[in-house]
Amino acid sequence: MIERVKGTRDFLPEDMAKRRWVFEKIREVFEAYGFKEILTPVMEYTKLFQLRSGEEVVKQLYAFKDKGGRDVSLRPDMTSSVARLYVNSFQMAPKPIKWYYIANMFRYEEPQSGRYREFWQAGVELIGSDKVEADAEVIALFVESYLSTGLRDFTVNIGDRILLDEFAGMLGVSDDIGLMRIIDKRDKLSQEEFINLLKEFGLGESEIEKVLELVEIKGRPDNVLPLAEELFKSKKAKEEISKLYKLTDLLEWYGVKDWIRIDLGIARGFDYYTSIVFEAISPNELGIGSIGGGGRYDNLIEIFGGKPTPATGFAIGIERLLPILEWKGLIPKPQTGPEVFVIPLKDMEKVAINIAVKLRREKIKTDIELSGRKLGKALDYANRVGAKLVIIVGKRDVERGVVTIRDMESGEQYNVSLNEIVDKVKNLLKR
């Protein structure tokens, strides 16, 4: 027997109904904000991801040579692909460009709660504006996307890569990305493990104390940003903190400030982020951490051969969000069975087909008995698959111009004229 590939899953009808519900909730909000859907190839040249995705992501690539000897990889994220698409075809398009996607990604990592080797993300990219208003628009959409699913218990934590760069300079550290990677892991480590990593990196006691001070600068913007002003003295840092003040003020006007926190220890795992970064956390007992994140990447398009073009965006981790929504009871029980099941008795198949066609054309989910079962077994099947109504098409009834409709929940039966079947079904289904 051939097994399923490790780290992947099969989605059954009930699973797909739940996923589709989440996708559509998020899609509605994306489109309400003026974003338009795109999809890029699942494969790209490996070099695209090696240029700027980050050491950890590059290590996790599903990379191989195709039959032409070209190095290709399954996409580990969409931002690089979107930047490539922009450079290829849209540099002269009106700005800003607002795109969204709902797509699957691949990373060779150890499967665990909320983490798989094939996973889905819903995300947006806003290309062509370096204004803090663009950051506010994207972060507000990030918050609204979670709210659209009924989730309320979450926070969006905002950090800044420029401030981390300035902090590395304050410590005299030349390998700022190396320091960021350690800081970014702090929530996954004990205090002792975190300090040991900083020591191995080459920091002394006084520098480690400053790092510990930095990672504690987190909380509501009004409380945290004054602390950041005390820690950072350079002109560049002051300008960035001023931007964070403006950002949080704008987010208040969007009506989402209650979900916003500042966390200056956030770096995110991708090397292409250049300024504001953010991630969403929802408390849970499932072992799931971040449920999505994003940030500004003003240099990526230039690295891929385009003209310097600012951009910002985010991705929501569906495999992380969906279990939390289920755990909190926020996903409606899906209706995977037919709304109507039509059972033809002897020689009544053509009439049954005609009835099914009329219902289907009214977008009523209709199935038909195709196995030739006797009435009792066909009714058992209809009950097992969750049909709400059964239409029994018998020869004597049809000769009188009627059929029998049975409500499977109440057990009530109705003799209904052939010409009134659609209206009666809609009435019983409360359409």
UniProtKB/Swiss-Prot annotation:
Keywords on record: Aminoacyl-tRNA synthetase, ATP-binding, Cytoplasm, Ligase, Nucleotide-binding, Protein biosynthesis
Keyword Chloroplast on entry: no
Classification via InterPro entries: aa-tRNA-synth_II, aa-tRNA-synth_II/BPL/LPL, Anticodon-bd, Anticodon-bd_dom_sf, His-tRNA-ligase, HisRS-like_core, HisRS/HisZ, HisRS_anticodon
Gene Ontology MF: a single term: histidine-tRNA ligase activity
A Gene Ontology biological process term: L-histidine biosynthetic process
UniProt-listed PANTHER family: HISTIDINE--TRNA LIGASE, MITOCHONDRIAL-RELATED, HISTIDYL-TRNA SYNTHETASE
Full protein name: Histidine--tRNA ligase
Species this chain originates from: Pyrococcus horikoshii (strain ATCC 700860 / DSM 12428 / JCM 9974 / NBRC 100139 / OT-3)
Lineage: Archaea, Methanobacteriati, Methanobacteriota, Thermococci, Thermococcales
